[in-house]
């Protein structure tokens, strides 16, 4: 039985009152047929039609009264349907949207980029379908979501934690034949899940983004075009499993769940099985803190433990500071991989933001540092341009597994690299 919350009770009573008032207004003929839609840039605007074949306002030709659809004569009744019935919306409650990200980068390192250098390419052609689970008065509600991606980010977004057949080079789910298209391009399905909620408790099951870290998979969720070393090398991107989110109070959420390791798609690899959980809390009106941990059999990298901690401080209306820490200990690495990232973002105006990112990433006893500076320019509400410059260096020389250096395939000692990148994102 759902716990009764007196505040929710008041909302329910208020909702009933609002419904009765709306009903009385409808009798008086004062009805607005168009609902306001939140976040309209991600929702298709649709025109609804009655099944007589005409828009309601012009249904006089179908035998309806010419003063609109407040009533019909005998000529309007077709197949048991009438023009004054409720409109049918096949996308009722479903949000459809996405984005297209095109980018250029002067250098591609062994650790921190996808695609080809010095080429303008499609990084993410992204579309999603989502029905948000919206609970009313503590009742359980169902929802679902699917995300589908094509581009040079595809190979870094699919279920690359799945086992691959040594002969064919293909695996399960979005590693099957047909998903890889050549020239660095591939399809991916980073999310495909169902969820249920009663307002305080949300259960998500399927394939979904990780809770780890600060930067995210979709380009629209990050200030910078390039990613931090920690995201690409110390964190999972996705999981398959079940995770529960419990709202403890208005200021705190707790997460707990089971996953089939890291970056797997609806299969286990080497009996992968791990815990994923943590919490997020508002320390004050301006500061939030999130701690996420996972441990167990991660699959491709064996048994391990990882955690990430993110402190987000909204200093004022324009200035935001973020501190992010990662720790990974896994059998495959045989050592601790640690990272600290710091972000400082200043909003010059509603259309222009400037930001900086400082990184320290340490793996196998060798440290890598990076400084990134960039802009977010919005000439239109659905267009974002992100130019940036990034400087990477490793005093001791960062060596990849194949013996090459991580920067421009250069020399081992005293490595450094400067990268210029820019992308443009169109949202719909």
PLM-predicted stretches and their roles:
Residues 1-16:
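Bacterial Sec-dependent N-terminal signal peptides
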Residues 107-117, 155-193, 197-280, 290-295:
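Surface-exposed coil loops of outer-membrane beta-barrel proteins
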Residues 251-253, 270-365, 369-370:
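Detector for outer-membrane/organellar transmembrane beta-barrel domains
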């Amino acid at each position: 039985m759902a716990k009764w919350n007196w505040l929710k009770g008041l909302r329910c009573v208020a909702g009933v009152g609002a419904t009765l008032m709306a009903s009385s207004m409808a009798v008086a003929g004062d009805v607005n047929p168009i609902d306001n839609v939140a976040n309209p840039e991600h929702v298709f605007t649709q025109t609804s039609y009655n099944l007589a074949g005409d828009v309601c306002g012009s249904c006089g030709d179908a035998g309806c009264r010419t003063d609109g659809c407040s009533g019909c004569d005998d000529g309007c009744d077709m197949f048991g349907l009438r023009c004054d019935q409720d409109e049918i919306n096949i996308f009722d409650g479903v949000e459809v949207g996405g984005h297209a990200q095109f980018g250029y980068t002067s250098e591609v390192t062994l650790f921190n980029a996808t695609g080809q250098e010095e080429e303008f390419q499609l990084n993410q052609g992204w579309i999603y379908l989502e029905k948000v689970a919206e609970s009313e008065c503590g009742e359980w509600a169902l929802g679902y979501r699917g995300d589908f991606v094509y581009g040079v980010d595809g190979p870094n977004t699919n279920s690359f934690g799945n086992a691959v057949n040594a002969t064919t080079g293909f695996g399960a789910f979005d590693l099957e034949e047909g998903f890889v298209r050549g020239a660095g391009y591939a399809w991916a399905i980073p999310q495909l899940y169902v969820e249920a909620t009663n307002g305080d408790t949300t259960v998500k099951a399927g394939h979904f983004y990780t809770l780890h870290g600060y930067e995210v998979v979709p380009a629209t969720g990050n200030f910078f075009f390039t990613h931090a070393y920690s995201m690409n090398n110390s964190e999972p991107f996705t999981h398959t499993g079940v995770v529960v989110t419990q709202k403890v109070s208005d200021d705190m959420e707790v997460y707990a769940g089971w996953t089939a390791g890291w970056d797997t798609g609806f299969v286990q690899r080497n009996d992968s099985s791990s815990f994923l959980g943590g919490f997020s809390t508002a320390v004050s009106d301006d500061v939030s803190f999130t701690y996420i941990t996972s441990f167990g059999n991660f699959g491709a990298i064996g048994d391990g433990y990882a955690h990430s901690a993110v402190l987000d401080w909204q200093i004022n209306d324009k200035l935001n500071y973020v501190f992010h820490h990662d720790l990974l200990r896994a059998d495959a690495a045989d050592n601790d991989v640690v990272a600290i990232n710091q972000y400082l973002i200043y909003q010059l105006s509603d259309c222009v933001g400037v930001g900086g990112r400082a990184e320290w990433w340490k793996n196998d006893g060798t440290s890598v540092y990076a400084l990134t500076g960039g802009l977010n320019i919005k000439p239109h509400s659905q267009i974002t341009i992100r130019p940036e410059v990034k400087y990477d260096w490793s005093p001791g020389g960062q060596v990849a597994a194949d013996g090459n250096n991580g920067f421009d395939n250069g020399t081992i000692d005293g490595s450094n690299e400067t990268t210029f990148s820019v992308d443009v994102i169109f949202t719909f």
